[in-house]
Curated annotation (Swiss-Prot):
The keyword Glycoprotein does not apply. GO terms for molecular function: DNA binding. Residues 15-44 are annotated as: Nuclear localization signals. Belongs to the circoviridae capsid protein family. Disulfide bonds: none annotated. This is Capsid protein. One of its GO terms (biological process) is viral capsid assembly. Homomultimer. Assembles in the nucleus, presumably in an immature form, then migrates to the cytoplasm once assembled as mature virion. Interacts with Rep; this interaction relocates Rep into the nucleus. Signal peptide: none annotated. Its main location: host cell. Residues 1-40 are annotated as: DNA-binding. Pfam families: Circo_capsid.
Length: 247
């Protein structure tokens, strides 16, 4: 009859007409204009981050006191901004009001490569953030690893060295400073930040404030092992302060 058809084309048109349409994502006809918002530019309390590094040699002496037995020893590293400032020939000038050390990295690798080290022993590294770290400069032989029981201790092999990151903590007493009459006050602004002044403060001892610290233990090897040690500090400075005018 007229108006009816059993062909495939007619069935497809009827099904397409009454079927639920697919939901499509709206396509913008015109390109949207970019809106430029004015960024806030702070003129005070700007924070500048600098990376400071230094390298030195460290040796683990061979065992001579108890040959044939396994003995351990330990050492530690603390951080001070003054250790990273070069005095000669070009002394560094820090024209900032305050600073704080946000992150530190210690890396120690054997100078001859790990293939040349004939020792397979391992020790541990641990972050110690109080004055107790000074106890780990051992001189007497230890029959057990003194850092293995510490929370957060990590194993390192004497033939490969290690690399470890930590957040140093400023010391709050004056016993660890090079001079006893220098103050190590923190000038805490809040519970989370501790800015140490550079320009003022008692005796201007800001750069000499010690920061704790990482301790590392090692088995005493049968031969002396020489390492190259690299320390890296990520230091934040604020409030750029140029030189004072002459009076």
């Amino acid at each position: 009859m007229w108006g009816t058809s059993n062909c495939a084309c007619a069935k497809f048109q009827i099904r397409r007409r009454y079927a639920r349409p697919y939901r499509r994502r709206h396509i913008r006809r015109y390109r949207r204009r970019r809106r430029h918002f004015r960024r806030r530019r702070f003129t005070t309390n700007r924070v500048y981050t600098l990376r400071l590094t230094r390298q030195f040699q460290f040796k683990i002496q061979k065992q001579t006191t108890s040959v044939g037995n396994l003995i351990f020893n330990a050492d530690y590293i603390t951080f001070a901004l003054d250790d990273f400032l070069q005095a000669v020939p070009n002394p560094h000038a820090l024209n900032f009001e305050d600073y704080r050390i946000k992150l530190a990295k210690m890396e120690m690798r054997p100078t001859g490569g790990h293939y040349t080290v004939q020792s397979n022993g391992f020790g541990h590294t641990a972050v110690i953030q109080d004055s107790r770290i000074t106890k780990f400069k051992t001189t007497a032989d230890q029959t057990q690893d003194p850092l293995a029981p510490f929370d957060g201790a990590k194993k390192w092999f004497v033939s490969r060295g290690f690399k470890r990151l930590l957040r140093p903590k400023p010391q709050i007493t004056i016993e660890d400073l090079t001079t006893a009459n220098q103050s190590a006050a923190l000038w805490l602004n809040s519970a989370r930040t501790g800015w140490i002044p550079l320009q003022g403060g008692p005796n201007s001892a800001g750069t000499k404030v010690r920061h704790y610290g990482i301790a590392f233990s090692f088995p005493q090897p049968e031969q002396t092992i020489t390492y190259v040690t690299k320390l890296t500090l990520y230091v934040q400075f604020r409030q750029f302060a140029p030189n004072n005018p002459s009076t």
